[in-house]
Amino acid sequence: MLGQRKLLIAASGTGGHLFPALAVAQELPEYEIHWLGVRDRLENQLIPPHYPLHTVNFSGLQGKTPWAKLRPLWQFWGVFWQTRQLLKQGDFQGVFTTGGYIAAPAILAARSLGRVAILHESNALPGKVTRWLAPWCTLVALGTPASLAYLQSKRLNLRVTGTPVRPDILHPGNLELPIPKAVPLIVVMGGSQGAVAINRLVRATVHRWLEAGAWVVHLTGNHDLDAPTIQHPHYLVFPFFEPMGPLLHRADIAISRAGASTLAELTLTATPALLIPYPYAAEDHQTVNAEVLVRAGAAEMIPQSALTGDRLGQIILEWLGQPQKLQAMAENARQLAMPNSSQQVADLIRRLIPAP
């Protein structure tokens, strides 16, 4: 379309990067949007066909051996030049990225051409790419005010917007599961990639919750070898579940990792949560994310190393017997929610990339 604005979105790898980017894209129907991703990553399944997907071969910049560190550097410069060429040939006015290693070559390619580069950082502890490249960005949008403490610089153009979420989180329909309205519901989720350790802890104790009258929806991810081991009509097991909005709005308790997008969804659905941060996350950033909700009284956190099946079982049983506690946690979560994040980020993009 003549005069249509063109935007390249660079988001790859996990739901934490992809879902916020998709939420923003849906707020920009007047833009021609293309997607930059990595071969064989989750975006190849999630990105709708109306966003042309351009994939590159890139494995990030971390490595243990000298060769493992050198090879990604060669890949990085290859991706940089590919992205630069894509921006020029496609006449894109700018790049929007949600972080991760695909963000680095995308930001640098855009700025080398004098194009707009907008970065959204969801984590309370900004990732290395954000800390290194924020000064190069036209604007950095933040998922939480907690991130400001790590990005103190007069050179940075920062806005706290919250983390964009899938539309069904904000506008849930009916939950298409046969769960009675009056029973307590526990939802277990390990993020877009699942969590084998959480799966094992839950299966060691879930019978206690079922005996107490609760229903459990357990989202295991695709790498769950023990899925058939427990059979119970009130224990519903899925690798993933869509849409998540109705499920989280119905949940009384969530047991979850502490990815930034997941925590945004928990606040927007006012779901009390027991958080078990992924212990191998870069710079332990999930613990920093979880601490934001813990300080607000919206969640409790236990390190995976300190948790057993018995302890997990007892904590949840105690919560089930304390409805006032759960109600207070839900209200505290609601106070943290930022429901207009997608629109805020989209409006910032419109201001920086106006109609030609």
From Swiss-Prot:
Its EC number is 2.4.1.227. Pathway: Cell wall biogenesis; peptidoglycan biosynthesis. SUPFAM superfamilies: UDP-Glycosyltransferase/glycogen phosphorylase. InterPro entries: GlcNAc_MurG, Glyco_trans_28_C, GlycoTrans_28_N. One of its GO terms (biological process) is cell wall organization. Coiled coil: none annotated. GO terms for molecular function: UDP-N-acetyl-D-glucosamine:N-acetylmuramoyl-L-alanyl-D-glutamyl-meso-2,6-diaminopimelyl-D-alanyl-D-alanine-diphosphoundecaprenol 4-beta-N-acetylglucosaminlytransferase activity; undecaprenyldiphospho-muramoylpentapeptide beta-N-acetylglucosaminyltransferase activity. It comes from the Bacteria. It is found in: Cell inner membrane. It is a peripheral membrane protein. One of its GO terms (cellular component) is plasma membrane. It catalyses: di-trans,octa-cis-undecaprenyl diphospho-N-acetyl-alpha-D-muramoyl-L-alanyl-D-glutamyl-meso-2,6-diaminopimeloyl-D-alanyl-D-alanine + UDP-N-acetyl-alpha-D-glucosamine = di-trans,octa-cis-undecaprenyl diphospho-[N-acetyl-alpha-D-glucosaminyl-(1->4)]-N-acetyl-alpha-D-muramoyl-L-alanyl-D-glutamyl-meso-2,6-diaminopimeloyl-D-alanyl-D-alanine + UDP + H(+). Keywords: Cell cycle, Cell division, Cell inner membrane, Cell membrane, Cell shape, Cell wall biogenesis/degradation, Glycosyltransferase, Membrane, Peptidoglycan synthesis, Transferase. UDP-N-acetyl-alpha-D-glucosamine binds at T14, G15, G16, N123, R166, S192, Q286. Cell wall formation. Catalyzes the transfer of a GlcNAc subunit on undecaprenyl-pyrophosphoryl-MurNAc-pentapeptide (lipid intermediate I) to form undecaprenyl-pyrophosphoryl-MurNAc-(pentapeptide)GlcNAc (lipid intermediate II). HAMAP family: MurG. Belongs to the glycosyltransferase 28 family. MurG subfamily. This is UDP-N-acetylglucosamine--N-acetylmuramyl-(pentapeptide) pyrophosphoryl-undecaprenol N-acetylglucosamine transferase. It comes from Thermosynechococcus vestitus (strain NIES-2133 / IAM M-273 / BP-1). The gene is murG.
